[in-house]
UniProtKB/Swiss-Prot annotation:
Gene: hemL
EC number(s) recorded for this UniProt protein: 5.4.3.8
Protein name (database record): Glutamate-1-semialdehyde 2,1-aminomutase
GO molecular function annotation: glutamate-1-semialdehyde 2,1-aminomutase activity; pyridoxal phosphate binding; transaminase activity
Keyword Cytoplasm in record: yes
Organism this protein belongs to: Caldicellulosiruptor bescii (strain ATCC BAA-1888 / DSM 6725 / KCTC 15123 / Z-1320) (Anaerocellum thermophilum)
PANTHER family per record: GLUTAMATE-1-SEMIALDEHYDE 2,1-AMINOMUTASE, GLUTAMATE-1-SEMIALDEHYDE 2,1-AMINOMUTASE 1, CHLOROPLASTIC-RELATED
Modified-residue entries (N6-(pyridoxal phosphate)lysine), positions: 263
Length: 426
């Protein structure tokens, strides 16, 4: 596979953009190949400027659940852009989008922002304002965006790259505990009695690789928060509208006080949201005294793309069952391939998101994820990409499927994975 044009553009870009990218994980820093410079996407395919075609299992890090450039989403955006781009003023589509999100995700109220980071940042500020407490509990390996308070023992690119330590003064009110470990949580509450405003968690972690929370863990976490007057925040930036219309909450039957959204909610455009119980949400300005603002928040183009996406998900009763069937096929056939190759591995999958871990048989938290064979995963990722299967370059990111993928696409993934295993036996 040739990447001559991509290399030229990428090298030139580094003169003007630090590292050549606007988000670190895109740089393929842990691989020996140049990141393909993408020029087009359609369905589950993306194309680079060198003319290479890939089956995409990254999907803009999970955002493109309908596939790239879904016609209904594109047409809705075209209709709007003729008359509306951004006003910094109320628009009718904000109301329609808010109503759709609240009814579909079963929350009382929602506030739109511009990214998942803004959503989690707003949720924590709101929790502190509502409870009058200062500290938050987060889990090692969970990634809640690039705001300073969340970068303590975070997943995603933070785990992969050697990054400068953040100012300890900024994170002094951030308590980090172990994912899926109730003793760790109970110890934090015991040592910080009446000081914890909220616990924030990815109910299915996606940035230490895919690692689902245990059902009983989330249930007891809900009870602990109730007991101590702390809010429970589900970060569903990845899982919101991906695992079901109600996100991961439908899988666990656990209701948080606040939930954050991103990725899918914007239909592929920059968008985030925080939603939840009315009595808490009404603390946001201008109704309450917890400040949040954004010039581009709720702009008509983003709202239109998000509305078209969620409406399409809602109107297709077989959407999630079809995705489950396809992802299940991928998991089953990969399991067979790796087993036949006598590899030690585990595949963590929830719905249409999954991660392959080599060198370990079980991954339930960040420490276990870090014990996996990172070098073998890098070799796997590089081999897959060179053979036109676009997967994350990092062990600590998830793979995703979309409605645009077919059984043939899954079979091609499995075929290349089998070739990779054969190459390792030589």
């Amino acid at each position: 596979m040739r990447l001559d044009k991509s290399k030229e553009v990428f090298d030139n870009t580094k003169r003007y953009i630090p590292g050549g990218v606007n988000s670190p994980v895109r740089a393929f820093k842990n691989l020996s190949i140049t990141p393909p410079v993408i020029s087009k996407g359609k369905g589950c395919r993306i194309f680079d400027i060198d003319g290479n075609e890939y089956i995409d299992f990254v999907l803009s890090w999970g955002a493109m659940i309908l596939g790239h450039c879904d016609p209904d989403v594109v047409n809705r955006m075209k209709e709007v852009v003729e008359d509306q781009i951004a006003f910094g003023a109320p628009t009718e589509i904000e109301y329609k989008m808010a109503k759709l999100v609240c009814e579909t995700a079963q929350i009382d109220m929602v506030r739109f922002v511009n990214s998942g980071t803004e959503a989690t940042m707003t949720a924590v500020r709101l929790a502190k304002g509502y409870t009058g407490k200062k500290k938050i509990v987060k889990f090692a390996g969970c990634y809640h965006g690039h705001h300073d308070i969340f970068l303590k023992e975070a997943g995603s690119a933070v785990a992969e790259l050697r990054l400068k330590r953040i100012d300890e003064d900024i994170v002094q009110n951030t308590i980090v505990v172990e994912y899926n470990n109730l003793d760790s949580v109970e110890k934090a509450f015991k040592e910080n009695k009446d000081e914890i405003a909220a616990v924030i968690i990815e109910p299915v972690a996606g940035n230490m690789g895919v690692v689902p929370a245990k059902k009983e863990f989330l249930q007891v976490l809900r009870e602990i928060c109730n007991l101590h007057g702390s809010l429970l925040i589900f970060d569903e930036v990845i899982t919101g509208f991906r695992l079901s219309l109600k996100g991961a909450r439908a899988l666990y039957n656990v209701e948080p006080d606040l939930v954050t959204f991103g990725k899918i909610i914007g239909g592929g455009l920059p968008c985030g949201a925080v939603g939840g119980k009315k009595e808490i949400m009404e603390c946001l300005a201008p109704q309450g005294n917890v400040f949040q603002a954004g010039t581009m928040s709720g702009n008509p183009i983003v709202m239109s793309a998000g509305y078209a996406t969620i409406k399409k998900l809602k109107e297709n009763p077989h959407f999630y069952s079809n995705l489950e069937m396809l992802a299940g096929k991928l998991e089953k056939e990969l399991t067979q391939v790796f087993s036949n190759s006598n590899l030690t591995f585990c595949i963590n999958r929830v719905g249409s998101m999954l991660t392959i871990f080599f060198g370990v048989e079980k991954v339930e938290n960040f420490e276990m994820a870090k014990m996996s064979d990172l070098d073998l995963f890098r070799s796997f990722a590089e081999y897959m990409i060179k053979n036109h299967i676009y997967v994350p370059s990092s062990q600590f990111e998830a793979m995703f499927l979309s409605v645009a993928h077919s059984e043939n696409d899954v079979e091609k993934f499995v075929e290349i994975a089998e070739e990779f295993c054969s190459s390792k036996r030589k």
